[in-house]
């Protein structure tokens, strides 16, 4: 089964980020902001697929701390190539989730 088919058969959610400083900060923030979750990172050279099961929260403040500079959540859109699940965006956080579970 290929990865597209696999994606439709699980409850994984999370961003697909272009490689770079922001992607690394998002990986670190995902681990900090979701301590009870196992965060899976697939390095695809040009991008990172960052996933966990059911729900992932990324807080602006945590990403800002990882970057070491001020950060606005709309900056995420520039490097967000895609995402798994649904997305709910706010000024202070972004949430990836599933409306229905498999």
Give the positions of each predicted feature.
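A short, surface-exposed helix-loop junction/capping segment
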Residues: 4-12
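Short, surface-exposed ligand-recognition loops at beta-strand->loop->(often short) alpha-helix junctions
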Residues: 14-22
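Beta-strand elements of well-folded, non-transmembrane domains
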Residues: 19, 34, 54-56
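Short, intrinsically disordered, mixed-charge
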Residues: 28-36
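Short beta-strand
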Residues: 39-43
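Helix-rich interaction surfaces within compact, conserved domain-sized segments
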Residues: 44-47, 51-102
């Amino acid at each position: 089964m290929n990865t597209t088919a696999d994606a439709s058969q699980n409850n994984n959610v999370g961003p697909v980020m272009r490689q770079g400083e922001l992607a690394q900060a998002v990986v670190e923030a995902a681990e900090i902001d979701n301590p009870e979750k196992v965060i899976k990172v697939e390095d695809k050279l040009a991008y990172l697929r960052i996933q966990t099961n059911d729900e992932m929260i990324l807080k602006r403040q945590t990403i800002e701390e990882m970057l070491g500079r001020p950060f606005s959540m709309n900056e995420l859109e520039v490097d967000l190539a895609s995402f798994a699940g649904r997305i709910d965006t706010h000024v202070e956080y972004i949430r990836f989730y599933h409306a229905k579970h498999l």
